[in-house]
UniProtKB/Swiss-Prot annotation:
The organism's taxonomic lineage, starting at the top: Bacteria, Bacillati, Bacillota, Bacilli, Bacillales
SMART domains tied to this protein: CSP (SM00357)
Name of the gene: cspB
Listed GO MF terms: DNA binding
Name of this chain's protein: Cold shock protein CspB
Chief localisation class: cytoplasm
Length: 57
């Protein structure tokens, strides 16, 4: 995770060799409060969103 704003519910994932990927809290799987921490490693799929690539699942 490059950065994630838990108040606004979105951030960006740094992908080696590619552009950063947008992530919205609704794409985070799990129960309860959905938040990601800077530097956290995550697995995800890249889907095409309204404004370009974004993370899913």
């Amino acid at each position: 995770i490059k950065w994630f704003n838990s108040e606004k519910g979105f951030g960006f994932i740094e992908v080696e060799g590619q552009d950063d990927v947008f992530v919205h809290f609704s794409a985070i799987q799990g129960e309860g409060f959905k938040c990601l921490e800077e530097g956290q490693a995550v697995s995800f799929e890249i889907v095409e969103g309204n404004r370009g690539p974004q993370a899913a699942n």
